[in-house]
C-alpha cells in the first residue's frame, strides 16, 4: 500500500505538470517544503529533460510576485508550487495583483489529506479558502489524496484551467492533498518515469484555443451610432491589461481608430502604445493642469484602466459628453468615476464593430483634427519650458529622472516603474519617451509589494531591464535577491534614495510637523545600501551628477547581471524645484 501511494503521488504529479506544459506553461517557481515533495521531485524530472524551467525561491511571497513578472513579460501562464500552512497565506499579495491586473498564474499548494483536517494536526489549516476572494477558480484534487485520482481527473483539472484563462485571465488556486509517504525510492521513481515517458510524455491533447477575435458578440449597433466620427473627440489610453502577445493587434486597431477619427491621443507611460502612432499629445497631464478648458469636444474613447492622474480624473468627472471605456481581458467594472459605457471585448473587436456601423468610414483616413493640433502645440510649448528648466543644473531630482532616463536608456530596452512616486512622475514628465519600448508597471492593486521580485521575473524573459524604484519599495522586497540565480539576471536597478516615502511630503506636509510626518508617514530608514548590496553580492554605484547617469548605464549594461545605481535625493530641493517648474508652466 505504501509503495502504491508513493508511486501514485509522483506519477500524478508528473502527469499534472506535464499537462500544464502542453497548455503553454514554461516556467515554475518552486518553494521549499515537505508536503509538496512529490511535486518538487516531478518538477525536477521534467526540468532535467528541459520540458519545464524550474527556479526556486525560499520566500513564497517573493515567489508569487516573481511568477507574476514572468507571466506578464511572456504572456504565458506560470506556476508556483508551495507546501502547506502559512506558505499558502504568503501567496495572497501576488494573487491580489494578478487578479486586478488580469495575469494568469496557477498557485499549486500541497495540503494534508481530509483525515487530518479540523482535528489539530500539525501545519494543517483551511488553506483551500485563503485565496478564494481573488482567484478566478479554486480547484482541488481528491480530498483524500491525489493518489486516488485517475487520468481523466488530472486532465479535467488542466482543461478547466485552460478554459478559465481563455475566458478571463487571472490567478487560479489548485490545492492538492498528499497522503504519506511523500518521498519515492530511486527504484520506484525510475520505474514510474519510464512508464510515464513511454505512454504520456509525448502524448498530444486537444485543448481549447483562443478564438477571441471571432467571438459572436451581440452588441447593439445603437451603441456605436452614439459616436459621431464627424465631430471632435479624444482617445485616452490607460495602463495596458492585455497579453504582451496581443500588443501588435492592439496597436494595429488603435492605429486604425486614430486614422478614421483624426482624434488626438493621450497615453499612459505603460499603455503599450507604439511611439509611431499619429496624434500623440505630449505633456497632456500638464495641459490638463494648466487649462483643461482648452479641450472642446463632446466624446471620449477610453482604453484600459484610469491612469494615476488626479487632473485626468477631475477632467473626466466633469466631462459632460459621451465616454466609452473599452477593456482588454477584464469583464469587471473598471470606471471609478462611473460615467462611461463599458465595452468588455477589447479594442480589436471594438474597432471592427465600429467600422461595421460606419461602413462609409472604412477606407477614409482623416488628418489630425484642429483640437489635436491645438493640444500638440500646447504640449510642445510645455516641452520647451521643461527643457529650459529641468537642466539648468545637474542636481538629480525625481522629476528630472522621469524626463531624462527614458531618453538615455537604450530605446529598445524595457523599463519597469515601481508603484508610488515613479509611475506618477513619469506620467507627468516623461513626454511619451517610454513608447519606444515595453514599459511595465503593476497598476492592478498598485502596491509597492513585490517590486524587486516582479522586476526579476520580467528580466528572466526580456532583458536587459531597467527597474526604477524608491528605497522603501526596494527594501520591502529585498528577499527577491534570494530567488535562484537572481543576481545573474540582467537587471539595472535605479534606486531613488530619498530615505523614506517622499510621496507623503506632497500629501501631508502642510498639516503635520516634521517629526510627526517622519514617524507616521515617511518612515525613514538609515540603510547602508553599499553594505546591503555587498551582502547579496550585487555591484552598486553611486551617482550624484545627472550628466554621469549615461555613463552609469553603460557600466551597468556591461556587467550583464543585477546591479544597483543609487541616486540620493534632497527632498527639500526636490519639492522647491518641482513647484517652481509647475508654476512656470501654469503661468506661461
Swiss-Prot record:
Its cofactor is Mg(2+); Mn(2+); thiamine diphosphate. Keywords: Magnesium, Manganese, Metal-binding, Thiamine pyrophosphate, Transferase. CDD domains: TPP_PYR_MenD, TPP_SHCHC_synthase. Transmembrane segments: none annotated. Its EC number is 2.2.1.9. SUPFAM superfamilies: Thiamin diphosphate-binding fold (THDP-binding). It catalyses: isochorismate + 2-oxoglutarate + H(+) = 5-enolpyruvoyl-6-hydroxy-2-succinyl-cyclohex-3-ene-1-carboxylate + CO2. The keyword Transferase applies. Binds 1 thiamine pyrophosphate per subunit. The keyword Iron-sulfur does not apply. It is an enzyme of class 2 (transferase). GO terms for molecular function: 2-succinyl-5-enolpyruvyl-6-hydroxy-3-cyclohexene-1-carboxylic-acid synthase activity; magnesium ion binding; manganese ion binding; thiamine pyrophosphate binding. One of its GO terms (biological process) is phylloquinone biosynthetic process. Pathway: Quinol/quinone metabolism; 1,4-dihydroxy-2-naphthoate biosynthesis; 1,4-dihydroxy-2-naphthoate from chorismate: step 2/7; Cofactor biosynthesis; phylloquinone biosynthesis. Belongs to the TPP enzyme family. MenD subfamily. Homodimer. Catalyzes the thiamine diphosphate-dependent decarboxylation of 2-oxoglutarate and the subsequent addition of the resulting succinic semialdehyde-thiamine pyrophosphate anion to isochorismate to yield 2-succinyl-5-enolpyruvyl-6-hydroxy-3-cyclohexene-1-carboxylate (SEPHCHC). This is 2-succinyl-5-enolpyruvyl-6-hydroxy-3-cyclohexene-1-carboxylate synthase. The lineage of its organism: Bacteria, Bacillati, Cyanobacteriota, Cyanophyceae, Synechococcales.
Amino acid at each position: 500500500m505504501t509503495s502504491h501511494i508513493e508511486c501514485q503521488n509522483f506519477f500524478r504529479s508528473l502527469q499534472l505538470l506535464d499537462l500544464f506544459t502542453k497548455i503553454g506553461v514554461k516556467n515554475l517557481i518552486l518553494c521549499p517544503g515537505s508536503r509538496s515533495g512529490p511535486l518538487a521531485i516531478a518538477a525536477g524530472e521534467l526540468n532535467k529533460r528541459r520540458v519545464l524551467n524550474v527556479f526556486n525561491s525560499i520566500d513564497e511571497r517573493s515567489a508569487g510576485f516573481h511568477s507574476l513578472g514572468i507571466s506578464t513579460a511572456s504572456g504565458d501562464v506560470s506556476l508556483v508550487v508551495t507546501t502547506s500552512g502559512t506558505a499558502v497565506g504568503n501567496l495572497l499579495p501576488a494573487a491580489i495583483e494578478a487578479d486586478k491586473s488580469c495575469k494568469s498564474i496557477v498557485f499549486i499548494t500541497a495540503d494534508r489529506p481530509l483525515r487530518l483536517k479540523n482535528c489539530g494536526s500539525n501545519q494543517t489549516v483551511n488553506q483551500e479558502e485563503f485565496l478564494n476572494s481573488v482567484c478566478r477558480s479554486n480547484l482541488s484534487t481528491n480530498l483524500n489524496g491525489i493518489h486516488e485520482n485517475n487520468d481523466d481527473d488530472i486532465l479535467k483539472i488542466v482543461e478547466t484551467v485552460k478554459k478559465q484563462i481563455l475566458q478571463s485571465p487571472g490567478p487560479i488556486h489548485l490545492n492538492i492533498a498528499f497522503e504519506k509517504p511523500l518521498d519515492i525510492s530511486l527504484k520506484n521513481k525510475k520505474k514510474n518515469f519510464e512508464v510515464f515517458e513511454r505512454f504520456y510524455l509525448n502524448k498530444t491533447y486537444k485543448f481549447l484555443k483562443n478564438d477571441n477575435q471571432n467571438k459572436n458578440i451581440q452588441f447593439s449597433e445603437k451603441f456605436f451610432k452614439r459616436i459621431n466620427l464627424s465631430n471632435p473627440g479624444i482617445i485616452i489610453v490607460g495602463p495596458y491589461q492585455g497579453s504582451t502577445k496581443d500588443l501588435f493587434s492592439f496597436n494595429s486597431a488603435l492605429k486604425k481608430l486614430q486614422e478614421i477619427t483624426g482624434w488626438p491621443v493621450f497615453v499612459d507611460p505603460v499603455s503599450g502604445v507604439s511611439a509611431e502612432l499619429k496624434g500623440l499629445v505630449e505633456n497632456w497631464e500638464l495641459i490638463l493642469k494648466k487649462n483643461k478648458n482648452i479641450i472642446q469636444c463632446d466624446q471620449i474613447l477610453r482604453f484600459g484602466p484610469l491612469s494615476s492622474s488626479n487632473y485626468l480624473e477631475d477632467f473626466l468627472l466633469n466631462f459632460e459628453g459621451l465616454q466609452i471605456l473599452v477593456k482588454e481581458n477584464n469583464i469587471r467594472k473598471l470606471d471609478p468615476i462611473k460615467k462611461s459605457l463599458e465595452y468588455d471585448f477589447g479594442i480589436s473587436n471594438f474597432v471592427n464593430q465600429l467600422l461595421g456601423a460606419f461602413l462609409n468610414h472604412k477606407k477614409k483616413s482623416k488628418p489630425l483634427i484642429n483640437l489635436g493640433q491645438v493640444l500638440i502645440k500646447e504640449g510642445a510649448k510645455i516641452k520647451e519650458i521643461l527643457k529650459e528648466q529641468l537642466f539648468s543644473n545637474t542636481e538629480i531630482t525625481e522629476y528630472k529622472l522621469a524626463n531624462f532616463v527614458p531618453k538615455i536608456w537604450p530605446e529598445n530596452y524595457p523599463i519597469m516603474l515601481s508603484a508610488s512616486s515613479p509611475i506618477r512622475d513619469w506620467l507627468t514628465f516623461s513626454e511619451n519617451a517610454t513608447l519606444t519600448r515595453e514599459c511595465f508597471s503593476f497598476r492592478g492593486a498598485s502596491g509597492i509589494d513585490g517590486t524587486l521580485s516582479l522586476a526579476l521575473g520580467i528580466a528572466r524573459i526580456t532583458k536587459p531591464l531597467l527597474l526604477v524604484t524608491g528605497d522603501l519599495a526596494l527594501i520591502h522586497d529585498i528577499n527577491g535577491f534570494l530567488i535562484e540565480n537572481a543576481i545573474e539576471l540582467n537587471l539595472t536597478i535605479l534606486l531613488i534614495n530619498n530615505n523614506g516615502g517622499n510621496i507623503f511630503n506632497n500629501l501631508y506636509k502642510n498639516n503635520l510637523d516634521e517629526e510627526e510626518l517622519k514617524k507616521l508617514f515617511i518612515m525613514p530608514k538609515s540603510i547602508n545600501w553599499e553594505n546591503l548590496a555587498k551582502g547579496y553580492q550585487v555591484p552598486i554605484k553611486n551617482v550624484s551628477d545627472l550628466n554621469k547617469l549615461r555613463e552609469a548605464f553603460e557600466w551597468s549594461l556591461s556587467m550583464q547581471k543585477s546591479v544597483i545605481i543609487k541616486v540620493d535625493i534632497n527632498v527639500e530641493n526636490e519639492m522647491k524645484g518641482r513647484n517652481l517648474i509647475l508654476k512656470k508652466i501654469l503661468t506661461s
